[in-house]
Amino acid sequence: MYFWRGYYFGKEGIWCQDFDKEEAFCVLKDSLYKDYMVRAVADNGKTIAVSRNIGTNEPLLMVDVDKKTIKNTISNHTFIYPCLDREGSKVFSVTKSDIYKNIYGNPFCVDAETGKVIATLDEKTQWGNTAYHPESNSVYFSAFKQPNLYKFNFDTLAFSAVSTDKKIRIFDCKVACDNKGYYYLGSNILVYMNNEDEEVWRINFKEKEKLSGKTLFSICLSDNPDYIAVYLLDGNWLFIVNRNDFSYKKYKLGRVGFSEFFNNSLLFIYKNDNFSTLNLETLEEKPFLPTAGAIL
C-alpha cells in the first residue's frame, strides 16, 4: 500500500494505491487539503498522518483511511520524521534543530487522541531519520552525522541506546522488510544489525568504489528480500546491493524527491510529483501511473 499527494483522475488530494488491488482511491479529495503531504503511515494501514509543511508547528491531521475522514488534529508540536505506532494511536518524532544558533530539541511521543506528550528523551542534539520496526512496535532513530543510534518502544514508552561503530557518522537507518534486523549507513559504510542489536555484516563502499568527495546518505529497502538501494549525496548514482552475496549494480540516477520499493521495482518520485519505476533485474526505467480505475 502506497500513499502520495497528487492530481489524478480530475481530483487533487491524498491518494492511496493498494498494490494487491486494481484500483487507486482518494483518501482526502477536498481542495482544502491539496497542499498536504503524507508524513507517516500506521503499520495496519488504517491511519495516516498528514500536514501542510515539514519542519513547522503546522497541525498534524490523523486520517482514517477506510472512512476517508479526519479523526483528530494534533497541534502545538513540530513533527520531524514522525512515526506512528502499529495502531496509529501514538506519534513519535524527533525535533527541529537550528545548528547555527545551537538550538536543539528533545525526541518525544504524543498520544494521537489527546495530543499530550507521554514520553521525552532527555537529550538534545541534531537528529536524523526515524525507522519504524513493526515486530517490536518500536522506532530506531539516529543523531545526525554522529555515531549514536537510539530505540523507542511504543508499548513501554522507554528509550534505549544502541551500540554502534563509533567511527561511523550515521546518515540514515532503515528496518529490514522481513523485520529480522535493520540497517544504518554512514561514512560510506552500510551495516546490517539483527534484532538483538548485534552487527551481522557490513559493506565499505569507500574501499570498493573510491568515493572521493562523495557521500552515501540514504537507504531504500525492497519487499523482495534480495535487494537494497543506496544513494549518493549528489543524487547522481544508485547502488543496488544484493543481500545474498553483497554484489551490487550501479545505475545513473539523477536527483529524485524520494522513493521506495514495491515488488521487484524501485518507485521514484521526481520533482513535480512525476512517477517512474526502475526494474531491479533489467535496470529498465519507465513512467508509472496509478491504475486506470479509481475510487473518488
Predicted features and spans:
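Short loop/turn segments that connect beta-strands within beta-propeller blades
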Residues: 18-22, 64-68, 111-115, 153-157, ...
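Beta-strand C-termini and the immediately following turn/loop, strongest in propeller blades
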Residues: 2-8, 28, 41, 49-55, ...
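Loop/turn-rich, solvent-exposed surfaces of beta-rich toroidal or solenoidal domains
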Residues: 213-236
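A short beta-strand motif characteristic of beta-propeller blades
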Residues: 23-30, 69-74, 116-121, 158-165, ...
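Solenoidal tandem-repeat scaffolds enriched in leucines and small polar residues
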Residues: 94-108, 119-134, 139-150, 154
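Blade-level signature of beta-propeller repeat domains, shared across WD40, Kelch, NHL, RCC1
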Residues: 260-296
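A short loop-to-beta-strand structural motif that recurs across blades of beta-propeller domains
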Residues: 13-15, 59-61, 106-108, 148-150, ...
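Repeated scaffold domains used in trafficking and secretory/extracellular systems
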Residues: 34-41, 77-86, 125-133, 168-178, ...
